[in-house]
């Protein structure tokens, strides 16, 4: 399951969380390496945007709690369909509407 996660860190001075920010990148690297995080980008100012490929909602919950333990943040979460799944859905739904 694909999820786009946008983080907005708690409002603290960036210099006060510099070490935590470095720890965050060390935490996320193994997730990038194993494909759990397909892509990640730092946001201009503060925060990050990550594309998670997760097997269960419980796993997503675990990862977001790990993330928030390092850098307290609020998360905007968007479930996604990959292109192949979206096209398959459109094909199936078009066939269903033609059958009636």
Name each model feature, range by range.
Residues 1-100:
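Conserved, structured core segments of small domains
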